[in-house]
C-alpha cells in the first residue's frame, strides 16, 4: 500500500466515524433535556428568567413580574409595551 492509498483509507475511516457520531448527536437532540441528569439539568433551568422585570420590553405578552404590561413612550417617542 502506498502513501496515497493510506491517506484515502484514513479519510474514508474518518468519514465513517463522523457519520456514526452524527447519528448519536441527532438522537440526543431529539430527546431534548432527557440526556441531562440531576445537577446539570437544574443549572440549565435555574438560569432561565421567571418573569420580565420593570421597564423591560414585554413582547409576545410575556408575564411581567408586576403582572401588568402597558404601552409607554421610549427614547425615540415610539409607543412600546413595557412591564410596570
Curated annotation (Swiss-Prot):
Locations listed in the record: Secreted
InterPro entries, A to Z: Omega-atracotox
Gene Ontology cellular-component terms listed: extracellular region
Summary of the tissues where the protein is detected: Expressed by the venom gland.
Marked site positions, Critical for insecticidal activity: 57, 74, 82
Gene Ontology terms describing biological process: defense response
Main location per the UniProt record: secreted
Presence of keyword Secreted: yes
Disulfide bridge map: 51-65, 58-69, 64-83
GO molecular function: calcium channel inhibitor activity; toxin activity
Propiece residues: 23-45
Family according to the record: Belongs to the neurotoxin 08 (Shiva) family. 01 (omega toxin) subfamily.
Role this protein plays: Inhibits insect, but not mammalian, voltage-gated calcium channels (Cav).
Domain remarks in the Swiss-Prot or TrEMBL record: The presence of a 'disulfide through disulfide knot' structurally defines this protein as a knottin.
Protein name: Omega-hexatoxin-Hmo1c
Amino acid at each position: 500500500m502506498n502513501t496515497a492509498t493510506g491517506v484515502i483509507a484514513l479519510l474514508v475511516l474518518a468519514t465513517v466515524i463522523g457519520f456514526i457520531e452524527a447519528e448519536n448527536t441527532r438522537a440526543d437532540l431529539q430527546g431534548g433535556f432527557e440526556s441531562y441528569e440531576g445537577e446539570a439539568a437544574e443549572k440549565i433551568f435555574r438560569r432561565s428568567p421567571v418573569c420580565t422585570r420593570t421597564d423591560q420590553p414585554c413582547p409576545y405578552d410575556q408575564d411581567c413580574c408586576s403582572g401588568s404590561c402597558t404601552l409607554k413612550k421610549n427614547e425615540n417617542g415610539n409607543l412600546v409595551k413595557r412591564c410596570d
